[in-house]
Every structure is written in structure tokens, then in C-alpha cells.
């Protein structure tokens, strides 16, 4: 729990512009390594998972720094993260939700304005499969705005990794 609290401090400092993306990445990577080292020793602990979620950069977009940072922050917040990587087709998001009925949130990332339609298509496909009653969709990335998130029917938009972890906790509650 101390490491999770420390990442919370890092997130707050990032929001206040006291640290920047490189420092966040260093802290998140340190947290991830620490968790990897401690995980075998925690096998019997009673830590409750915050839930399972899926994250990926939408089709046509190969950028992953922001997505990776968000994934690390979500893991540090106690989520089990299924990272689909980059350039993820709509069908892969749908298939992964089908294979993981306990998923609570699907996180979609895009850096390029040209791939924003793929984000819209993914939200529509998840709705067409009737998953929307069981999962929440969170979107983010440089060109994404709250207005766009509302327009495509996403449940949440966050502008940075620290906010993403906080919002995911709210959505999973």
C-alpha cells in the first residue's frame, strides 16, 4: 500500500506541474519493478483487486508512451490490466471483452487525430455487442477532449495518467 500511496503523490505532483512525463515514467517503472519483486511474497495476502480492465491504442495508431504510462498507473492503483498494445483493431477489443466477462473498464488511447474515428468505431462496436451495461469506457490521448468523449458515448475522459487512475477507481466502484 505504501507504493500505491507514493504513486498517488507522484500523480498529484504531475497534475500540479511539479514533475513531468519523464519523471512519471521513472516512478511508474520503479513501482512496476517493485511490484514484480514483491509479488511472489504477497501471494497469500488479502489485497483486493480494484478490478480488471483492458487498455489499448486504437487501430491505425502506433503510439504507446501515454498508454503505457496510464497502464502502469492503473496497475499501481490495484487494477489487473490487459494491455492489448498498439494499432488494436475494433474486433480485438470486442473479442477480449468476450473472453474476459469480469472486465469492468475498457480504456482507449489515441495520439493521432486521424485515428479518432477508430475510437468512435470501437465504442460503437462494444455497444452493438451489448457490453455497455457491464463495462465502462474511458478514453484519452493528446487530441481527445471531453466534448469528443461525450460525442462518441464514452463514460469518461481523462487528460493525464494520474487522473486516469482516479477516474478508473470511480468507474469500478
Label each region the model flagged.
Residues 1-139, 143-151, 155-173:
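Domain-level signal for soluble alpha/beta catalytic cores
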Amino acid at each position: 500500500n505504501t507504493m500505491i500511496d507514493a504513486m498517488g503523490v507522484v500523480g498529484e505532483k504531475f497534475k500540479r506541474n511539479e514533475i513531468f512525463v519523464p519523471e512519471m515514467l521513472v516512478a511508474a517503472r520503479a513501482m512496476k519493478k517493485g511490484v514484480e519483486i514483491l509479488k511472489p511474497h504477497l501471494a497469500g495476502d488479502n489485497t483486493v483487486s480494484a478490478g480488471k480492465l483492458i487498455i489499448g491504442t486504437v487501430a491505425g495508431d502506433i503510439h504507446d508512451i501515454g498508454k503505457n504510462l496510464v497502464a502502469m498507473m492503473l496497475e499501481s492503483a490495484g487494477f489487473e490490466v490487459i494491455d492489448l498494445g498498439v494499432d488494436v483493431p475494433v474486433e480485438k477489443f470486442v473479442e477480449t471483452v468476450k473472453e474476459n466477462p469480469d472486465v469492468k473498464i475498457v480504456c482507449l488511447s489515441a495520439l493521432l487525430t486521424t485515428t479518432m474515428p477508430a475510437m468512435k468505431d470501437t465504442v460503437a462496436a462494444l455497444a452493438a455487442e451489448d457490453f455497455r451495461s457491464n463495462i465502462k469506457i474511458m478514453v484519452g490521448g493528446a487530441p481527445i477532449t471531453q466534448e469528443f468523449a461525450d460525442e462518441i458515448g464514452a463514460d469518461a475522459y481523462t487528460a493525464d495518467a494520474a487522473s486516469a487512475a482516479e477516474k478508473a477507481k470511480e468507474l469500478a466502484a
